[in-house]
Amino acid sequence: GLTRFQVTIGEVDYFRGLCEEAGLDENTEKELRSCISGKNFFAAQELLEQKQIPEPYHSILLKLADMFENIESLEDAKSLVKNERSLQAIARLEKLRKRLEQYGVAEYITFDLGMLSKYQYYTGVVFKAYTYGIGDAVVKGGRYDNLLRKFGKDTAAIGFVIVIDDLLEALSRQKVVI
């Protein structure tokens, strides 16, 4: 199997709570999500300036790209907000990190609070898995509690997709025989 991989975990509620705290309307949040998820920080900066988002929120929202990889960044992220939604998101990630350490897999995990999906139905944790030999994620997924309500079932859910073609290509490049 694969031995060289990395799973990146984000938390949509951190971003949503921060947007609420900053007073962003729904359309601005949607546009900003698109900019940040596409790593288009020039567009994000332009949008925040255009909408006259005040400090410290202007800087904090742009800083999402830097809140990546280590637990110190989670501590930094916690210190930047006052709202309960964002603080709870960080608490969930810290709890998850501790559990992953207990299982001995923390070395394969990074955190990225700037990892936002263009799909607005995600409500909490989002994740992507990468491996050597492929430039894009081979696994993508997250939590989407409200999506099933649209189909008549009000329940929490989490799901993911495995990009089989990319995974098989990675296995081939890594000379993993299956």
Give the label of every model feature segment:
Residues 1-2, 47-178:
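Positively charged, Gly/Ser-enriched RNA/tRNA-binding surfaces
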Residues 1-4, 30:
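Class II aminoacyl-tRNA synthetase-like tRNA-binding/catalytic domains
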Residues 23-46, 53, 105, 131:
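Acidic, His- and aromatic-enriched active-site or binding-groove loops in soluble protein domains
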Residues 8-10, 36-40, 88-89:
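Short acidic alpha-helix initiation/capping motifs at coil-to-helix transition points
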Residues 16-19, 33, 45, 78:
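Amphipathic alpha-helical segments within well-ordered protein domains
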